[in-house]
Amino acid sequence: MTDAAGGRQEIWVEKYRPERLEDVVGHPDITERLQSYVDRDDLPHLLFAGPAGTGKTASSVSIAKELYGDDWQDNFLELNASDERGIDVVRDRIKDFARSSFGGHNYRVIFLDEADALTDDAQSALRRTMEQFSNNTRFILSCNYSSKIIDPIQSRCAVFRFAQLGDDAVAAHLREIAETEGLEHTDDGIDALVYAADGDMRRAINALQAASATGDSVNEETVYAITATARPEEIETMVTEALGGDFAAARATLDDLLTNRGLAGGDIIDQVHRSVWEFDVEEAAAVRLLDRLGEADYRIAEGANERVQLEALLASVALNAE
């Protein structure tokens, strides 16, 4: 848990990053296909699409480690398109890396994370660069939404879609880490971590490490406190109150979450959205709720006041209560 040389605590996301494709959690079908490329040393350009924390970066780094061994860092360039947007990164950094010496390997790998953040011009330049250096460079592009990648790039890549990780896979991995670290934990603590992470393994591991820093057992109360996440029953209570026509009670619950608990409006919307079909409500009520939820989410994204939009959401639901 602690770096002996520097006395600093290691980041568990890095400490437990998979070393091999077979260690990547939750996507055996994908890793098996990727392993066949590595075993043949015949890697095509790859496009990894899916939500954050599902194994896209872990798979890319594992590929490099298996292909290049101890030399993997010299033959693997990782760039984040959201940090380095525009045409310059495509023309300069990628080209400089692709043109440099190879150290005995047939090709090198460039990993471009959040490639869907690149402008259309940058993607067009990237497509030309992929063609220019295809004999000695392989590209792995990672994105949340493949629809934001231009067709000429998609047609040059083998596309792999990483689905959100299942709760069981996340829970099992968290228990392995907790046992390795000698960390006391409860079942409800692991369940809370899984709920807060919502399929994002990176978020789950970071939350586990943050919870461990309290020095106490990792339990439900600790997890919800350090992740600023509402308990599922709190979300259900707020929505049920509004659906029952009790706007004042629903607003009081919302106020507690926003003011006393410090939750962001967008996080509350996300939690309501993922839980709506688990509520004991009629389908028509759930549909109305989703319709208003979409409006509130859009307006908040456009810069509207979070509290006003969430209160308007609850008011609309309460007014339509049967």
UniProtKB/Swiss-Prot annotation:
Any Pfam family matching the protein: AAA
The keyword NADP belongs to this UniProt entry's keyword annotation: no
Residues the record lists as binding ATP: G50, P51, A52, G53, T54, G55, K56, T57
Transmembrane segments: none
UniProt cross-references to SUPFAM superfamilies, sorted A to Z: P-loop containing nucleoside triphosphate hydrolases, post-AAA+ oligomerization domain-like
Superkingdom field: Archaea
Keywords: ATP-binding, DNA replication, Nucleotide-binding
ATP-binding listed as a keyword: yes
GO biological process, one term: DNA-templated DNA replication
NCBIfam families in the cross-refs: PRK00440.1 (NF001679)
Protein family membership: Belongs to the activator 1 small subunits family. RfcS subfamily.
Function: Part of the RFC clamp loader complex which loads the PCNA sliding clamp onto DNA.
Name used for this protein in its record: Replication factor C small subunit
